[in-house]
Amino acid sequence: MSWMYVMPCANAVAAMRKHLDLVAGEGRACTELMRAMDGRVSLKTGAEAVFVAMIPDRKLGLAMKIEDGNSRASEAFLVGLLTQLGVLDAAHPMAQKRLPAPQINWRGYNTGELRLADGVL
């Protein structure tokens, strides 16, 4: 990668790690999961269930897109991936909130569970 791009990217990641609350806002997966990992990983979701993650300590970047555009699936997959990589504790409440994720209908009934299919990771 050209040095022309390296410094702006590094600056953006550093700003995201320092100001977690300004990335997405309270209650959003980006903010909650970055807090859960103490800012070691920078995350950002975009439109139609696009998610990116940057793990500077490992020099690793991830990008994913969920075809149907549903953020529930992208959040669950991202939590599964980050726990497999060892950067997110699966027992953390913010991870547990998203995987496995009970699906509650408007009457408050549990109608199922969102989980990763066997062999996905």
Give residue ranges: language-model regions:
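Structured C-terminal helix/loop/strand segments within mature extracytoplasmic catalytic/sensor domains
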Residues: 2-121
